[in-house]
Amino acid sequence: MKGKKFLVTGATGQIARYLAIQLAADNTVHAIARFSSASARERLEQAGVTCIKFDFANDDLAQLDSDYNYVLHLATTQEPGDRDFDNAIEVNAVATGRLMAHFHNIDAFFFSSTCSVYAPDGHTPLKESHPLGDAMRSHCPTYSMSKVAAEAVVKFAAEHFGIPTVIARMNVAYGRDGGLPLIHLEALRKGKPIYLNPQKPNYFNPVCDEDYYQQVLKMLAVASTPALVMNWCGSEQVSAEEWCGYMAELLGVEANIVYTDNAFPCTPCDTALMHSKIGRTNTHWRDAMKVLVENGAGDVRSVG
């Protein structure tokens, strides 16, 4: 994709930052966030991204340009232990509706949701039609339910304003500087325990940064009205136990896995719809994680 104009929200987050940087090579990209970290802003600007200090939930959207082709909405509130449900709904759902109402003339709207909106079902691969629930309740009580609310708002706005839309339910994203496998890698390096749910093995469908970037481009091409809801994940299912064991082997250490009910449950994905719409991912998880280990990548949220 070349010569298009993008608005990317939540641009200091792991996924949004990578998307913005990659898109900026051939497109005009405006990234909005609070930018409390000067280094995060500098990294984006060095890649050619125009950074705008902006709170999408509270600031006046009229301050932004009006000629974007695409809006990639990845900003969210997700705080461990948070119990302010009203604020979570306001930020994740209501403010998303205002964003879509303001930019209703765009070519497509991309909404980043989460597989934690599903009701946990053990090792069953979760289809897009699976019952919804609250998989993050023990870790972040407001997150899953506010994302369910946000999906409802996005569906309404897509249909009401006629905006081609994709609701992408992310499973486990990871890359050079973020994601669950990176948190586990840091724990392995420091000899710290890795906490997993007792319902072992903990299956997921992790997707690396290079793959999820290509997926976004393909999803924008199939955005529709009504909104298309799709799992956003890797084509391969693998357990956290297996990837921890693999990275531990590469490091020459032992993985200290501790099972606790406080860890969120696994969310393996059914990939049939995703494959039918945008095809398979290209990178084997072992290859991607080996690169992370060898390059010394680490997650900013890693254990101390």
Each model region followed by its residue ranges:
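Conserved Rossmann-fold NAD(P)-dependent oxidoreductase catalytic core, especially the SDR/UDP-sugar
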Residues: 97-142
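NAD(P)H-binding glycine-rich loop region in Rossmannoid oxidoreductase-like domains
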Residues: 38, 49-91
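N-terminal Rossmann NAD(P)H-binding glycine-rich loop of SDR-like oxidoreductase domains
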Residues: 5-25
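Mid/C-terminal beta-alpha module of Rossmann-like enzyme folds, strongest
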Residues: 190, 215-264, 271, 300
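Conserved C-terminal active-site "lid" loop/helix of NAD(P)H-dependent oxidoreductases
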Residues: 209, 239-245, 259-291, 298-304
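NAD(P)-dependent short-chain dehydrogenase/reductase
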Residues: 152-204, 209-211, 247
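Glycine-rich Rossmann NAD(P)(H)-binding loop
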Residues: 173-175, 196-203, 228-238, 260-263, ...
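Glycine-rich NAD(P)-binding loop of the Rossmann-fold in SDR/ketoreductase-type enzymes
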Residues: 87-95, 137, 141, 145-146, ...
